[in-house]
UniProtKB/Swiss-Prot annotation:
Keyword terms, alphabetized: Cell inner membrane, Cell membrane, Membrane, Transmembrane, Transmembrane helix
Membrane topology recorded in Swiss-Prot or TrEMBL: Multi-pass membrane protein
Top-level division of the source organism's lineage: Bacteria
Alphabetical list of PANTHER family matching this protein: INNER MEMBRANE-SPANNING PROTEIN YCIB, INTRACELLULAR SEPTATION PROTEIN A-RELATED
Role this protein plays: Plays a role in cell envelope biogenesis, maintenance of cell envelope integrity and membrane homeostasis.
Transmembrane segments: 22-42, 50-70, 76-96, 121-141, 149-169
Alphabetized Pfam families for the sequence: IspA
Protein name: Inner membrane-spanning protein YciB
CC annotations in GO: plasma membrane
Species: Escherichia coli O1:K1 / APEC
InterPro entries: YciB
Family from the record: Belongs to the YciB family.
Record's subcellular location: Cell inner membrane
Length: 179
């Protein structure tokens, strides 16, 4: 259910884009993201930090898109989010005692420190590459291609990378944890 909620604003954005235009889609994205945030608070009494950060960026970049009637702002939002994710992972890698990935998953999984570090770095690189791909597609290709890439391409890439990360984790888990 929670994963569905995370994708709901993206689905709403895509539907409004196909029916109306980028500006209606942006307004719908802001509203849908707010509704999901409110629902998460009411239902689970908790809002994830990343969901809150994403909401703030959606409101800021979406608001700028609507105010200036310029779709470049909403296109930049994707890259800014990925840059923040990558930055947080890299800072945790080099400044904190534990990589961020380990802080998020370390209670459920027992892995060697080197595996946590490689996984954390791999996700940082993934987010950097996705952000760069977004810049290229957003500003060098037609808007409809960017929307499709944002909705389907980045989602598919994230699911594939998550699957590959799961395989990598499984290969490095202690034998007793694999069952």
């Amino acid at each position: 259910m929670k994963q569905f909620l995370d994708f709901l604003p993206l689905v709403v954005f895509f539907a409004f884009y196909k029916i109306y235009d980028i500006y209606a889609a942006t307004a719908a994205l802001i509203v849908a993201t707010a509704i999901v945030l409110i629902y998460s608070w009411v239902r689970f009494r908790k809002v994830e930090k990343m969901a809150l950060i994403t909401f703030v960026l959606v409101v800021v970049f979406g608001g700028l898109t609507l105010f200036f009637h310029n779709d470049e702002f909403i296109k930049w939002k994707v890259t800014v989010i990925y840059a923040l994710f990558a930055g947080a992972l890299l800072v945790s890698q080099w400044v904190m005692k534990k990589p961020l990935i380990q802080r998020m998953l370390g209670k459920e999984l027992t892995l060697p420190q080197s595996v946590w570090s490689k996984l954390n770095l791999a996700w940082a690189v993934f987010f950097i590459l996705c952000g760069l791909a977004n810049i290229y597609i957003a500003f060098w290709l037609p808007q409809n291609i960017w929307v499709n890439f944002k909705v389907f391409g980045l989602t598919a890439l994230t699911l594939i990378f998550t699957l590959l990360s799961g395989i990598y984790i499984y290969r490095h888990m202690p034998q007793e944890d694999k069952s």
